[in-house]
């Protein structure tokens, strides 16, 4: 319940613009969020492995 409240709080427009921060759209994690995808590193990796993100694949060399 606390996480939902924090997600709702992050979605509101803050009084000052510098107080705004990004959260993962999938799980609500506040750290390590990629702006391009709107996902945290954990969800990004998970979705990339499942093939749910078009154009993203694991590189190997």
From Swiss-Prot:
It holds the Pfam family Ribosomal_S14. Belongs to the universal ribosomal protein uS14 family. Zinc-binding uS14 subfamily. NCBIfam families: PRK08061.1. Binds 16S rRNA, required for the assembly of 30S particles and may also be responsible for determining the conformation of the 16S rRNA at the A site. Binds 1 zinc ion per subunit. Keywords: Metal-binding, Ribonucleoprotein, Ribosomal protein, RNA-binding, rRNA-binding, Zinc. This is Small ribosomal subunit protein uS14B. PANTHER family: 30S RIBOSOMAL PROTEIN S14, SMALL RIBOSOMAL SUBUNIT PROTEIN US14M. Gene3D superfamilies: 30s Ribosomal Protein S14, Chain N. Zn(2+) binds at residues 24, 27, 40, 43. One of its GO terms (molecular function) is rRNA binding. InterPro entries: Ribosomal_uS14, Ribosomal_uS14_bact, Ribosomal_uS14_CS, Ribosomal_uS14_sf. Part of the 30S ribosomal subunit. Contacts proteins S3 and S10. Its cofactor is Zn(2+). PROSITE patterns: RIBOSOMAL_S14. GO terms for biological process: translation. It comes from the Bacteria. GO terms for cellular component: cytoplasm; small ribosomal subunit. The lineage of its organism: Bacteria, Bacillati, Actinomycetota, Actinomycetes, Mycobacteriales.
